Amino acid sequence: MALVLTVNSDAWNKHVESLTSTVSGLIPVVKGNGYGFGRDWLAQRATRIASTLAVGTVFEVGSVPTAATPMVLTPTLEVPHDLRADAILTV
C-alpha cells in the first residue's frame, strides 16, 4: 500500500516564509529522503532560506547546492576523499 502526500504549496510556502522572518540564524535540515519531498529538491528550496544547510551524514553533502555551505550533523570516523572542502563536520 502506497502513501501519497499532498501539500498545499501556497499555505506551506507562507508558513515557511512566516517562520523564517521570525527566527534569526535558522539552519534548515535536509536529510534522509528529504521528508518525502526528495533531498535534492528540498535542499534547493532551503537555499532560499539560508546559506548553510545541515545534512545527516557526509554521504548527503552532495545534495547541498554549491552556493550553500553544508553542515554535517552526524560525526564520522572516515571522511570521504571527495568531500567538499567547505563542509562543516561535527565531532
Residue ranges and their predicted role:
Residues L3-T6, A11-K14, S24-V91:
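Active-site-proximal beta-alpha core segment in soluble small-molecule metabolic enzymes
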